[in-house]
Amino acid sequence: MKLHEYQARDLLARYGIPVTGGGVAVTPAEAHAIAEQIGGPVVVKAQVHVGGRGKAGGVKLAQTPAEAEQVAGQILGMNIKGLTVEKVLVAEAISYERELYLSAILDRGSKRITMIASAEGGVEIEEVAKTNPSAIVKIAAHPTMGLLDFQARELAFRIGLRDGKQARQFAQIAGALYRAFVESDASLAEINPLVIKNDGNLLALDSKVLLDESGLFRHPDLAALRDPSAEPEAERRAREADITFIKLDGNIGCMVNGAGLAMATMDVIKLSGGEPANFLDIGGGAGKEKVKAALQIILSDPNVKAVLFNIFGGITRVDEVARGILAALEEVPTDVPMVARLVGTNEEVGRALLAGSKLIPAATLAEGAQKAVAAARGELVS
């Protein structure tokens, strides 16, 4: 689950991490009041769950409360990558000397929580990894004792913080960020940039926190922060239908049962020269209604040029999947070509149900992926 910037800022502040002053506004008048309370220049920032807000005009500097009200009026209601801005963060504008980067992630390679730091903050860490990988420092926390003090100090030293006061502050912030990550069941806790202000003190200027959906039952206070209006419509519908769904940038929709099989399906699509439009796992034992909801979600993406069904029926019955596909197509007629690889429990019944449809059959995953790629290119018709 994604937190808005203002929610992430408030969460980190609970752990003693210094953050900017300010507040969230849903009207221009509220933005005016917050800026007036701050009493100096402010930054008005759109609160939406997408990147590139600044380039889209969703981040603006305001020198006065009146200007803050004006720019808030421009940003509120703005459409950024398909999401409507309903809230803005009005934060004090900070003068600073240097930008740093700091984050906590779960490194699945080492199977440990890893702290990442860089002297090059303010830009995407992925870009730094490409252009100057030596500027990135990684230290894995101890699996039972957590991030140790000497590790936090080592992070500070290795990114070039030689001033004792700044190094101590950085180490304290790193320790606090680690605790926030662990105690919130986060999958990412990031401060970018972590700035050194003109007075020499450190401050978290922007932050990002992603929470593990599977851990939210332990954190009702954090679960209550979910903003359905800020989620893409497809992701909201998938969550309500108990479907695991992640939108991607390709044009081949995928419906699969099982996360491992779904990842393998995406891999084979790419190996066949295509690009998956989504990760979608209907789970074990999915019935007709869930399958119907899943297909409707896939078809709601205008980029989808073909759909691949890869169902291995164990707990999930192939005939139930077939009924769900037919039910969805009755409600949402489409010309999008569809390829079906259906094997397992009741597969003969499922195939018989789909025999009169326009679905393109495939005996293997490789064949299904190749046919889906060809269909997306307009080279194969049902």
Curated annotation (Swiss-Prot):
GO terms for biological process: succinyl-CoA metabolic process; tricarboxylic acid cycle. Its EC number is 6.2.1.5. Its cofactor is Mg(2+). ATP binds at K45, G52, R53, G54, I94, E99. InterPro entries: ATP-grasp, ATP-grasp_succ-CoA_synth-type, ATP_grasp_subdomain_1, Succ-CoA_synthase_bsu_CS, SUCC_ACL_C, Succ_CoA_ligase-like_bsu, Succinyl-CoA_synth-like. Pfam families: ATP-grasp_2, Ligase_CoA. It comes from the Bacteria. Keywords: ATP-binding, Ligase, Magnesium, Metal-binding, Nucleotide-binding, Tricarboxylic acid cycle. Substrate binds at N257, G314, I315, T316. GO terms for cellular component: cytosol; succinate-CoA ligase complex. Residues 9-237 form the ATP-grasp domain. GO terms for molecular function: ATP binding; magnesium ion binding; succinate-CoA ligase (ADP-forming) activity; succinate-CoA ligase (GDP-forming) activity. Belongs to the succinate/malate CoA ligase beta subunit family. Succinyl-CoA synthetase functions in the citric acid cycle (TCA), coupling the hydrolysis of succinyl-CoA to the synthesis of either ATP or GTP and thus represents the only step of substrate-level phosphorylation in the TCA. The beta subunit provides nucleotide specificity of the enzyme and binds the substrate succinate, while the binding sites for coenzyme A and phosphate are found in the alpha subunit. Heterotetramer of two alpha and two beta subunits. This is Succinate--CoA ligase [ADP-forming] subunit beta. It comes from Chloroflexus aggregans (strain MD-66 / DSM 9485). The lineage of its organism: Bacteria, Bacillati, Chloroflexota, Chloroflexia, Chloroflexales. The gene is sucC.
